[in-house]
Design a protein with these regions (language model features):
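Nucleotide-activated chemistry modules centered on ATP-dependent adenylation/adenylyltransferase
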Residues: 1-201
Length: 201
């Protein structure tokens, strides 16, 4: 990859734990970006943020809170309330969160982003990677979240990209096993759903 810093979009401490450890062991320092307007209720959002912060601080890492913007998220999900898991609502949710991640990376001068969502057994890696590529190619935010991928290849890195999407399957390489160990070591709160209120129905 060539970079020593990456902006890591983080959904919760358990999903991020082994990924952060692996990055550090590889000489890469993650800046942890907590951007999760999908999480409901607010108390759940706060618990997950607190656990992410606890883990980041234990490792001396920076964590950035993108603030809770659930109303905007609900507005974007209008009409998708009854979509199944891994359907159109998930893709749009990923796009919204990863676009904000990419835009923040550009503000900070961080060249590479990735997400802990790619460690979740509940989510589609294809959707996550589509959303990540789309976010990095549409940094100006003028493209509608409903638009298609709108980039010329599944793994193309274009010269106009100010931020690059790091496509990585964070479920492999022993990370799932290590994640379970870290959860026990830190006694993390371990969420049993992605955070979306519509998934609870």
């Amino acid at each position: 990859m060539g970079e020593t810093t990456v902006l890591l979009h983080t959904c919760c401490a358990p999903c991020s734990s082994a990924i952060i450890e692996a990055l550090l062991h590889s000489g890469i320092t993650p800046v942890i970006y907590y951007c999760n307007p999908n999480i409901y209720p607010f108390e759940e959002y706060e618990i997950r943020k607190r656990e992410c912060t606890r883990y980041a601080q234990s490792l001396g890492l920076e964590i950035v809170d993108a603030d809770y913007d659930h109303d905007s998220w609900l507005d974007q999900m209008t009409g998708l309330e009854n979509e199944p898991e891994r359907g159109g609502r998930c893709l749009k949710c990923f796009k919204m969160r990863l676009l904000r991640t990419a835009q923040y990376a550009r503000e900070r001068g961080i060249k590479v982003i990735t997400t802990t969502l790619a460690s979740s057994r509940w989510k589609s890696l294809d959707q996550i990677n589509e959303a990540g590529r789309w976010a990095c190619y549409n940094l100006d935010g003028t493209s509608d979240l409903d638009a298609g991928e709108n980039i010329p290849g599944t793994s193309t890195i274009l010269p106009q990209n100010e931020v690059i999407w790091w496509e990585q399957n964070w479920r492999k390489g022993g990370l799932q096993e290590r994640r379970l160990q870290i959860i026990k070591e830190y006694d993390f709160y371990n969420p049993l759903y992605c955070g979306c209120e519509f998934r609870l129905r």
